[in-house]
């Protein structure tokens, strides 16, 4: 058996695995210090009671011969697909265009596998590292970096005379924490249509958007139905990080260059490769969508963002994002950070683990990402430490 040559293009360790190893090493060498880990975007708040009860009831039905069921529908429970159409998309996406899955990351892999190798894939720089790794694993012909710089409000800049097949676009963005407004997103959709680009729109953090002027879905731009696929997840909105449930939207109007509908092939693809997501998880998500606006977890994380942003600004750092996403994009100055390695600076001096911006791409150099998804008590300790000079730690 020959090794898949696509693995040769990957780094030895995935970014967050490497950070875990470095934190563990610091723990072993400095057991007297408590490290506050604000590096990885993992959730900490429990399920809402209504969601947990729906989950328990669904599981209980599997224990009785009279209510047991086997496989569910390949594309998801009709009740959940309909609820998503009504509650999140307000009718601009039909239930038949929504496909329930076991998470956004695996859907990204499925989609890039579905469209096949030798695609030219464009990604924002900085961006979630899984986009590039998955593109490489699925045999992308080329990966085009779209610089998202501070002086351009972190908007992607498209290179001239460069062909792109697929654009991975995330808003609210990981890692910058910034969100596209409707005019900005409309311009990208227009560019994609003019240049025959398919947009894979990652809306995993849309639940954090609170401003009516900011789109939660790319399909708030009507023309996006001709050029975009959207992926989303219940990991942050309902606390399903360890439960695994997401969805993909493929509009009926989206076609190949020969006019054939993509949704038809996607159904065939899923029927072969996927037997449907967990039924208890889907029933729990259906219950959660009924009370989505009342769920406390997102509000909790947004308050964490506010606390961190306030402390970081007082400590002299430049801070971006955090208002409509659970991430803060932080730029230390030479005066505040004498270290070359920003991860080591925060770990050694403040005993806080963050994600170095360079891990998200070359344009992330000089920045770090703070996650607000931690526990409040940890965030408060981090805020207190940030108010102290490093020498006093």
From Swiss-Prot:
Cofactor(s) the protein requires to work: pyridoxal 5'-phosphate
Recorded GO MF terms: L,L-diaminopimelate aminotransferase activity; pyridoxal phosphate binding
Statement: the UniProt record of this protein carries the keyword Transferase: yes
Binding of substrate, residues: 14, 41, 105, 128, 174, 275, 369
EC number(s) from the headed UniProt entry: 2.6.1.83
Alphabetical UniProt keywords: Aminotransferase, Pyridoxal phosphate, Transferase
Pathway the protein contributes to: Amino-acid biosynthesis; L-lysine biosynthesis via DAP pathway; LL-2,6-diaminopimelate from (S)-tetrahydrodipicolinate (aminotransferase route): step 1/1
Keyword Cell cycle: no
Superkingdom classification of source: Bacteria
Positions of modified residues (N6-(pyridoxal phosphate)lysine): 236
Catalytic activity: (2S,6S)-2,6-diaminopimelate + 2-oxoglutarate = (S)-2,3,4,5-tetrahydrodipicolinate + L-glutamate + H2O + H(+)
Chain positions recorded as pyridoxal 5'-phosphate binding sites: 71, 104-105, 128, 174, 205, 233-235, 244, 275
EC class: transferase
One Gene Ontology biological process: lysine biosynthetic process via diaminopimelate, diaminopimelate-aminotransferase pathway
Residues making up the signal peptide according to the UniProt record: none
Classification via InterPro entries: Aminotransferase_I/II_large, DapL/ALD1, NHTrfase_class1_PyrdxlP-BS, PyrdxlP-dep_Trfase, PyrdxlP-dep_Trfase_major, PyrdxlP-dep_Trfase_small
Family under the similarity heading: Belongs to the class-I pyridoxal-phosphate-dependent aminotransferase family. LL-diaminopimelate aminotransferase subfamily.
Subunit: Homodimer.
UniProt-listed NCBIfam families: DAPAT_plant (TIGR03542)
Role summary: Involved in the synthesis of meso-diaminopimelate (m-DAP or DL-DAP), required for both lysine and peptidoglycan biosynthesis. Catalyzes the direct conversion of tetrahydrodipicolinate to LL-diaminopimelate.
Protein name (Swiss-Prot/TrEMBL): LL-diaminopimelate aminotransferase
Record organism: Chlamydia muridarum (strain MoPn / Nigg)
């Amino acid at each position: 058996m020959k090794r898949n040559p696509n693995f040769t293009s990957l780094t030895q360790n995935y970014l967050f695995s490497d950070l875990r190893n470095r934190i563990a090493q610091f723990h072993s060498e400095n057991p007297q210090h408590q490290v506050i880990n604000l590096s990885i975007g993992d959730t900490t708040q429990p399920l809402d009671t209504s969601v947990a009860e729906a989950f328990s009831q669904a599981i209980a039905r599997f224990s009785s011969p009279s209510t047991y069921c086997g496989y569910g529908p390949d594309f998801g429970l009709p009740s959940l697909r309909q609820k998503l159409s009504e509650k999140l998309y307000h009718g601009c996406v039909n239930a038949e265009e929504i496909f329930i899955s076991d998470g956004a990351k695996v859907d990204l892999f499925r989609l890039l596998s579905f469209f096949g190798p030798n695609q030219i894939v464009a990604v924002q720089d900085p961006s979630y590292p899984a986009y590039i790794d998955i593109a490489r694993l699925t045999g992308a012909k080329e990966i085009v970096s779209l610089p998202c710089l501070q002086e351009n409000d972190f908007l992607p800049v498209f290179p001239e005379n460069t062909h792109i097949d697929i654009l991975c676009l995330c808003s609210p963005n990981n890692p910058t924490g910034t969100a596209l407004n409707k005019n900005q997103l409309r311009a990208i959709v227009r560019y994609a249509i003019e240049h025959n680009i398919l947009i894979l729109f990652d809306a995993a953090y849309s639940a954090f958007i609170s401003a009516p002027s900011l789109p939660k879905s790319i399909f708030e731009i009507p023309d996006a139905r001709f050029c975009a696929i959207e992926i989303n997840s219940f990991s942050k909105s309902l606390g399903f990080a360890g439960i695994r449930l997401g969805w993909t939207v493929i509009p009926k109007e989206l076609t190949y260059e020969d006019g054939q509908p993509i949704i038809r092939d996607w159904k065939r693809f899923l029927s072969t490769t996927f037997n449907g997501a967990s039924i208890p998880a889907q029933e729990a998500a259906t219950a959660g969508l009924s009370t989505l606006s009342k769920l406390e977890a997102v509000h909790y994380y947004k308050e964490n963002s506010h606390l961190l942003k306030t402390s970081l600004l007082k400590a002299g750092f430049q801070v971006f994002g955090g208002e409509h996403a659970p991430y803060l994009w932080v730029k230390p100055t030479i005066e505040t950070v004498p270290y070359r390695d920003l991860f080591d600076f925060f770990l050694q001096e403040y005993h806080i683990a963050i994600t170095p911006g360079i891990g998200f791409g070359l344009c992330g150099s000089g920045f770090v990402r703070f996650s607000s998804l931690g526990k409040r008590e940890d965030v408060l300790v981090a805020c207190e430490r940030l108010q102290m000079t490093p020498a006093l730690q």
